[in-house]
A protein has these predicted regions:
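Alpha-helical, largely C-terminal catalytic domains
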Residues: 1-142
Length: 142
């Protein structure tokens, strides 16, 4: 099979896999509804907030990088599940599950694309760059 077709197959396998993000319920109600928000709705809302709020950052922000970070930051929960404040799961245990999920999910992608998203997820987890800090602030603002 042609290399480009293999890459496209891998990309569409990844797209089908991340559709599962819609099944992960968060412990946040949807405004005006009596149901929990799911991870995909959360990511969409945060991404739009980033587009509109990034100009207010104290530091220059790469908006595309920040939006991408927001769109991928919870993909690991497809494997690890969403952990809320009173779940009883230790931070170490949750991080280990998320790390394993990140390796599997981003590992589905063609090597360069997978590495790029994995590194971006790690940057979010570290919370040290301007983009990661803005991402974390936007998440905490909801």
């Amino acid at each position: 099979m042609d290399e480009k077709l293999k890459e496209l197959d891998a990309l569409f396998d990844f797209f089908r896999e991340i559709d599962k993000e819609k099944l992960i319920e968060r412990k946040t109600y949807v405004t005006g509804a009596v149901r929990w928000e799911n991870d995909a709705e959360h990511a969409w809302h945060m991404a739009l907030m980033t587009v509109l709020l990034s100009e207010y950052s104290n530091e220059p922000i790469d908006v595309l990088k920040t939006v991408t970070m927001l769109l991928i930051h919870d993909l690991v929960e497809i494997d690890a599940g969403d952990t809320y404040a009173y779940s009883g799961v230790s931070k170490e245990e949750q991080h280990a599950k998320e790390e394993k999920g990140a390796a599997r999910i981003f590992g589905m992608l063609p090597k360069e694309k997978g590495r790029k998203l994995y590194d971006l997820w790690q940057e979010f987890e570290a919370g040290e760059t301007a983009e990661a800090l803005l991402t974390r602030w936007i998440i905490s603002s909801r």
